[in-house]
Structure formats: structure tokens, C-alpha cells
Amino acid sequence: MLGDQAPIKELAEAAKKHDAVVLVDEAHSIGVFGKTGRGVAQEQEVEHLVDFTLGTFSKSVGTLGGYCVSNHPKFEILRLVCRPYVFTASLPPSVVASANKALELI
């Protein structure tokens, strides 16, 4: 929350060396960092090195809920085994529409 940025490229190199994944929490950087406001990974031009990106809609987007996005091959299994996710409810359509519009404006 102080504007500090992790050295994502160096962390991704270490992760690759140790067969680990890279997860970036963009909760406080969406709408602030990056050419189009996508966050620190976009700012550092390393989005292609990130396996999982997560964030919240309750900060700069001004709604509620959150997200985790990934192209990682094991992403789908996480949706099935993560107990906090399994017991969540879908966001109401009005919240999704509000978040979508806020992201368009950002």
C-alpha cells in the first residue's frame, strides 16, 4: 500500500529455477500502475512471466468481490480443491456490471 514494487522478473527467474509458480497480488495496483492500469506486472512488462494474478474489486474498482486469473494448466484443479472458493457464491449481475464499467473507465 506504500507503492513498493516487487522485482517480479527476478522472482520469476527464481521460481522457474525451483519449479515454482509466480502469483502476483494486484489488489492495490489496479488502475494505478501500468500503461492501461493493469497493475505492477504490466508496469514492469512481465505479465507473460506471471502464472496467477489476483486482486480485489473493493479498492480502485469500487465494488465488491475479487478475481484470480491464469492460463496455468493447473488453474482448473485449484477451482475444484480450494475450499474457500468452493463455498463462495457468484457475484450478483449488478456488481459484475458495475465492476465491468469501472474497469472500462480505468
Show which residues each predicted segment covers.
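Active-site C-terminal subdomain of aminotransferase-like
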Residues: 18-24, 28, 33-106
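Active-site core of PLP-dependent enzymes with the aminotransferase class I/II
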Residues: 1-19
